[in-house]
Amino acid sequence: MTATAPTPTLSAFDATRMPRTALVTGAGTRLGKAIACHLAQSGWRVAIHYRSSAEAAESTAAACATLNPSVQPLTFQADLADSNACDALIDAVGQAFGQLGALVNSAALFEHDDALSTDQASMAAHWQANTLAPIRLTQRLYHHLIDKDGCGAVVNLLDQKLWNMNPDFFSYTLSKSALETATTMLAQALAPRLRVVGVAPGLTLTSHMLS
């Protein structure tokens, strides 16, 4: 019988083991683009994810390179509605950069419904995009860090609506509420190797839904 190598363990988070490479999902536009640009300006190598807006993602990459020519940002396409695509995205970024230390789950589905109009299709779509995809990406990143014996961080974008509740965007709000709970549980389960936190921005950049 072949012996299985033990999983490397850590007694505490070690920032020196955290590669300065970050994947930002939904980084082609709005808040995701701003986050990617800030990371690049701060010296992080940035992987720019997009689903269908390749031109916007390339624009973000160009902006990052202008802010810091040394970071050499790359773009990656993936449909996060597919769990296998989530795994493949983490693997592709890790292979392209050699390592991955941070994940910013910025991509989100934000479609209007309410308590009377919501249905199974709307709930399922929001759940997959806003809850399951961030969880799956976090799981894959954790295993990547185990393989590299590194440390990392995940930032989940939540929404101020969770603390200023109103009945519109019903499916979206429920999916973000689930992500907020998942953030706490993942942080407890994956520490100290992987830090998982959430931030809940208010109105920051123009949304096509609200313009």
What are these language model-derived features?
Residues W44-E58:
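Conserved glycine-rich Rossmann-like NAD(P)H-binding loop of the short-chain dehydrogenase/reductase
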